[in-house]
Amino acid sequence: MKLRKISAVLLSMAMAVSMAGCSSGGGGNAADTGAAAESTEGAESTDGAEEEGASAASKDTYRVCFVARASADTFAAWLTSEMKAAAAGYDNIELTCVSGEADDNTENGLLEDCITKEYDLVIVQSNNNAAQAPYVQQLTDAGIPVITTNPTTHQDDLDGSGDNSVLTGTGTVDADPIAQAQVGAERAVEEVPENANVVVLRGPSGNFHAEKRREAWDTYFFSQREDVNILYEDYANWNSDEALTLMEAWIQSGTHVDAIISMNDNMAAGAIEAIRQNPDYVNADGTTNFLAYGVDGTAQGCLLIKEGMLTCTALQSASDLAKKNMEYASKVLNGEMAITDVNDYVDAPEINAENVDEYIQIYVDNGEISANQLGE
């Protein structure tokens, strides 16, 4: 089936295509993926204070750095691609993209580098909220405006105070991880068979979205379905390869897995790949003997739904996140608003077999899926 081939191709390609370093807008040069690109000289932007905002507004080009968490994370790769596209719409913004490669030390080093290179504004996608929070604070202390995105960095991440407000001095553009996971969890209450055995794939420990999505499954599914048995649960860190390895080991027990509960589409895809050729899970006619739930609504996830392998996902639109990030970055840099006034969230609509064609068409239109690959 062509869709199976497409899913496999996306699984391997998504990690490489979007995370190449970028410099968009203002005619900038390409940046190195693993470290911040060399910066041009320029005055630091401010936190939106009136007199400093007026000074910032006089610059011809603003240098913005997006620090993504990992190139192997298909959503982070998608978000990077969309950041480049959104930045291209602003003539006075030069965007540099770098990746922390799912390593806290690497990402923290990149955040320190943003201070050294005096970026005018930094957009941070943390790998581990608590690990990155002190370095986000260093950026704000240096007078560099910071927007945290996917996930938000909270005050509690810095000081353990239990204060879940946005980290002091920063702004955020995000999605609600509880609402995202609630989409699949509520469906699963009705769909998962009685006394089912399920496996749970978790994102990185300490990551706000990973933890809150898992909490949502407790609230909206496991508390309602006490008959369900969690056969295995482990951290696959948003990574499809790690999920594939875990699933290959789990099915060796011989106990049938009735449902895959994954905190993102990428891990779900890896687990599905592990059982794709197993007749206990996929029949000769392509129908399945398992359910699978994801989050993110990636092109890969949509194709798996179309194929009948993924039951549903919740869209976390990287396009919307990127557009909002760049819109607010522009307003802050041009002195139109304070960084602390940036507080916006995107919706999480459900994608399932009934409406997946609508979302696949979006990916065809933006080039992430080709019409030829779909056989159209």
What are these regions (language model features)?
Residues 1-63, 88-89, 137-144, 368-376:
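Short, low-complexity disordered leader/linker segments with a strong preference
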Residues 57-59, 107, 170-198, 243-244, ...:
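Hydrophobic alpha-helical segments within soluble ligand-binding/sensing domains
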Residues 57-90, 96-114, 119, 125-130, ...:
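Extracytoplasmic "Venus flytrap"
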Residues 58-61, 201-209, 220, 224-227, ...:
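Hinge/cleft segment of the Venus flytrap/periplasmic-binding protein
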Residues 65-67, 118-126, 145-150, 199-200, ...:
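Periplasmic-binding protein-like
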Residues 75-89, 180-184, 208-228, 242, ...:
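Short, solvent-exposed amphipathic alpha-helices that sit
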Residues 124-141, 217, 232, 236-304:
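Hydrophobic alpha-helical
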Residues 134-179, 298-306, 311:
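Flexible loop/hinge segments that line or gate small-molecule binding clefts
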